[in-house]
Amino acid sequence: MKIALIAHDKKKEEMIELAKDFEDKLSKHILVATGTTGLKVMQNTSLDVKRCKSGPLGGDQEIGAMVANHDVDMVIFLRDPLTAQPHEPDISALLRLCDVYKVPLATNTESAKLIMADI
């Protein structure tokens, strides 16, 4: 299974903790991430992560293309709902594509934990 990991700046620490908590499970899957999220996960775990561009520089769109091409099976996107994002249209497009292609999507740590418990 290919799993995409994305976290807004204020959610990066939560993503690191999630990756640590589920490191054993995640290690059995192919991981892709936006640039900084992937780097931080790799720096804090033993997980191998293929890094796309940073979200604001096109990384969300890269992962959206993977969703549209059936090249990713699950997306964990820890969003910061209290901070405006300059690339909000890209984020909305990615979320829409997950719905269109019925790709499981977690946008907070609790929903991510529920999904991770099942992989």
UniProtKB/Swiss-Prot annotation:
EC number: 4.2.3.3
A Pfam short name: MGS
SUPFAM superfamilies: Methylglyoxal synthase-like
One GO cellular component, as annotated: cytosol
Keywords tagged on the record: Lyase
SMART domains: MGS
Reaction(s) this enzyme catalyzes, per UniProt: dihydroxyacetone phosphate = methylglyoxal + phosphate
Protein name (record): Methylglyoxal synthase
